[in-house]
A protein has these predicted regions:
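Surface-exposed, charge/polar-rich loops and edge strands
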Residues: 1-210
């Protein structure tokens, strides 16, 4: 939510005037997102469940743009990337409830969902969700996610990221590191520190492009 603070009504109006499609997502941020990573290995850090809501119009816009998006904030990232794995679960053809679509912390990395994902494009995953809404007469998807995005994660939907500067030993910094494929985040943060950028929720922002 805090990355969006940089988008004033004037900025949003200019984006709309340029013909850029934009949508809003809902994710109820869990405390685990901000809990410092104290474990020696990331496998020892537990993410809390976060509840999400995505409207039909957002899914239709994603399909229009081949399931590619610029995310504003790490909250949007977790929502969009979780959508992909929810769509992967629907590829099975089984009749699932919205609760069944919950994305567990390590599902993108290992197990049957990760194996199925190898054969499901982001576009197909979003189409699966839209078809699910059609079958059940729903206008929005309500589900949950425990996803953790860390180095080694393969981004599916998010192609660019607008985000603030995060504190050390945080899952948010892990997410940024994964987005930039490892090393480049050090250079960005060194530059920010040497030029007195402001960090955290009310600080400066960045546009990250892998």
């Amino acid at each position: 939510p805090t990355a969006g603070l940089h988008f004033t009504p004037e900025v949003l109006a200019s984006i709309d005037a340029a013909g850029v499609d934009r949508e809003e997502l809902t994710l109820h941020v869990g405390a685990g997102t901000f809990k410092p990573v104290k474990a020696d290995e990331i496998q020892g850090h537990e993410m809390h469940t976060e509840y999400i809501c995505v409207h039909r119009e957002t899914l239709e816009k994603l399909i229009k743009h081949n399931a590619e998006a610029i995310a504003v904030g790490t909250t949007s990232v977790r929502t969009l990337e979780s959508l992909y794995y929810m769509g992967v679960k629907l590829e099975s053809g089984l009749e699932l409830t919205e609760a069944d679509l919950h994305v567990c912390q390590w599902e993108p990395y290992e197990g049957p969902v990760a194996a199925t994902a190898a054969n499901v494009t982001p576009l197909k995953a979003i189409q699966n969700i839209l078809a699910y809404l059609d079958r059940h007469g729903l206008n929005s998807l309500h589900s949950s996610t425990q996803i953790i995005i860390a180095p080694g994660y393969n981004y599916k939907i998010v192609k660019m990221l607008v985000t603030n500067f995060h504190q050390p030993q945080s899952t948010l910094l892990l997410l940024v590191s994964a987005f930039l494929h490892g090393g480049d985040w050090h250079k960005i943060y060194d530059y920010a520190l040497s030029h007195d950028f402001r960090f955290l929720s009310y600080g400066d922002s960045s546009l990250l492009i892998p």
